A protein has these predicted regions:
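Class I S-adenosyl-L-methionine
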Residues: 1-86
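Hydrophobic structural segments
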Residues: 86-340
Length: 340
């Protein structure tokens, strides 16, 4: 019967000399199999050893140490014995996201994926954020998260330098992993556009614009028609941010939407017969185009039209990985301020 004392587990072992040479890098590894990792004490001890081995493995990888492969094998061996106390790797979470929002479906200009760290990162806590900023990295470290999942890629354009203040540098320094799901999550079922439609209470949603064979924008109907100004206020109140809007001069019933920077879909929204179009940000000529076409256009902010996906994503992943704690970042906010 093991006895615990803080982070140590004591038990009685009977060993005999066998003259077999033991790998002195990790003495006692053969005894790991004798530990009952299904017991609360054994599981807690095994998790501590996994974290310790993961730190060692990370250092070995940085130094290109040939022993890194053996250490990773040891990590996976211990993890495989923890029935009922599953160990989750970052790669498994990446694969789960890839199932419902395939990374290969991202737009050509995009850079989603596992951008910092390793698939073999052991994950107990995950932070979810729209952007990976220095503040978010510091929050992840303080709250014990080893993986950050963001919507916007932490590395988007090619880097010519990597200063210490860059979030990717900070993540590597703290041995964190980053998975970024951008336009693949925008267009996925249950992704940004779906969540935006739900936030606005739209019904009977269907695609109105396509990127290859994927829905780039959705079209739905309001339960109750509204005037253009009332609809703009409705969007503001539903999404919680300031809005710019063009008065289309007619009652709004059918609404097109695209989260983020969707102003390029203005023409298609008109062609689809929408009374209004909701997106995050638009250009001046797109405002003029909407005005000329009698389309009420509401630019509700990039941040506000995309943050709607964060909590549903957290819930979805928490259901898939109940042993992992998923939490939304608290230090990220809309960088754009509105003065009424």
């Amino acid at each position: 019967m093991p006895v615990t004392d803080n982070d140590r587990v004591y038990t009685v072992m009977l060993a005999r000399y066998s003259a077999t040479e033991q790998n002195d890098t990790f003495p006692g590894f053969d005894f790991v199999g004798a530990l009952d990792v299904k017991s609360p004490e054994g599981a807690a001890y095994a998790r501590r050893q996994l974290r310790h081995l993961t730190r060692i493995w990370g250092g070995q990888r940085v130094k290109d140490d040939p022993a890194a492969a053996d250490t990773l094998t040891m990590i996976r061996t211990i993890a495989s014995r923890m029935d009922g106390h599953p160990v989750v790797f970052a790669g498994e979470i990446y694969d789960e996201i890839d199932r419902f929002a395939p990374f290969a479906t991202a737009m050509d200009f995009d850079n989603p994926g596992l951008l910092v760290g390793s698939r073999d990162q052991i994950v107990e806590k995950v932070m979810i954020a729209l952007d990976i900023t220095p503040q978010v990295v510091r929050e992840a470290v303080s709250r014990g998260a080893s993986l950050i999942i963001s919507h916007h890629p932490v590395i988007f354009d090619p880097l010519r330098t990597l200063p210490e203040a860059h979030p990717a540098y900070m993540m590597a320094h703290h041995r964190l992993t980053a998975i970024c799901a951008h336009t693949n999550l925008d267009m996925a079922p249950g992704g940004v556009n779906t969540c935006l439609a739900e936030a606005l209470g739209l019904q009977n949603c269907r695609p109105f614009a396509w990127y290859h064979d994927l829905p780039e924008g959705l079209l739905g109907t309001l339960p109750t028609p509204q005037s253009a100004e009332a609809f703009a206020r409705y969007v503001r109140d539903r999404l919680g941010g300031g809005v710019q809007w063009v008065d289309g001069g007619r009652t709004v019933h059918t609404v097109a939407l695209c989260g983020g920077a969707g102003g390029n879909l203005t023409t298609q929204a008109v062609q689809a017969g929408a009374d209004a179009f909701v997106t995050g940000e638009v250009r001046h000529h797109q405002l003029l185009e909407a005005q000329a076409a009698g389309l009420t256009l509401v630019a509700a902010g990039h941040y506000c039209t995309e943050r709607v996906v964060l909590e549903p994503l957290r819930q979805r992943l928490a259901e898939a990985f109940p042993a992992v704690e998923f939490m939304c970042a608290e230090t990220v906010s809309d960088p754009a301020h509105t003065i009424a």
